[in-house]
């Protein structure tokens, strides 16, 4: 397992040097952020990013993400051209030696929260989705701008996209468009040596009348059966799936591990109910997820891949502008998960490897 950390490029207030100082940190999860959605990523852009990360003593373990254009999701006539561009990006990621691409197939926006600073009992704040906040709200009729929405759209464009989904695209239509996309890109991913890892819908249930399809156990089974290859895998985001109390994330994790189809791990904890959900500290007791149980499964199945602590509370005066992506709580989470990993590895009679090659610099006796 390679502990990894999301980094938003040169504009991220969290620096690579700060990330490198987290004990046991090996990988960076990042993307090319200056290429418009739908265009192919040039190889030189990827190599420049890779060099920057490697000069800091880290490696890019996952690209998160190459966004899927809405016209692909909606099955529009120009989707083949857009898919060819996507395939070019996959080839270039493979040529750069990066093994995994995380992506999603969520309509319009990547994730939705109603509150970025909801208080927790420990005095910190975190991201929350409170259904009561959105009761009776319509993003088409109301002047609404929620966290996680794609800022590349104007409000009028976003309203048009939402209306098209509502009127013309059912969940089965979205499934059909996803299948078309998967069957088009997977041979390229296999040839390039890149494993694809679809992220679940966040939250994993319908909102605003939009179709949502990657939501739970049955959806994961259906998705994996679209194309039978280890390159067609999932991002096991336990926090996203656990945001719906109906999902048994331990059972889902074991199912996907048995099929060797977890290509990336996101680990955040949540507490959830009929009211919605709130993200918590990573500790098992802080939320609904048995995090030790999750890590034990990874060890039991000898899972080899990148895991990143996903989202963090706002603590210790963290002023990051990207919700959930401050340094401090994610660093605590990384250390916590490395501790769980070492404990479970040693209990299984195995020796964990955190990639630490040099234990000191200079004269040990000085």
UniProtKB/Swiss-Prot annotation:
Its cofactor is Fe(2+); Mn(2+). Signal peptide: none annotated. Its EC number is 4.2.1.8. Pathway: Carbohydrate metabolism; pentose and glucuronate interconversion. GO terms for biological process: D-glucuronate catabolic process. The lineage of its organism: Bacteria, Bacillati, Bacillota, Bacilli, Lactobacillales. PANTHER family: MANNONATE DEHYDRATASE. Belongs to the mannonate dehydratase family. This is Mannonate dehydratase. One of its GO terms (molecular function) is manganese ion binding. It holds the Pfam family UxuA. InterPro entries: Man_deHydtase, Xyl_isomerase-like_sf. Keywords: Iron, Lyase, Manganese. Catalyzes the dehydration of D-mannonate. It catalyses: D-mannonate = 2-dehydro-3-deoxy-D-gluconate + H2O.
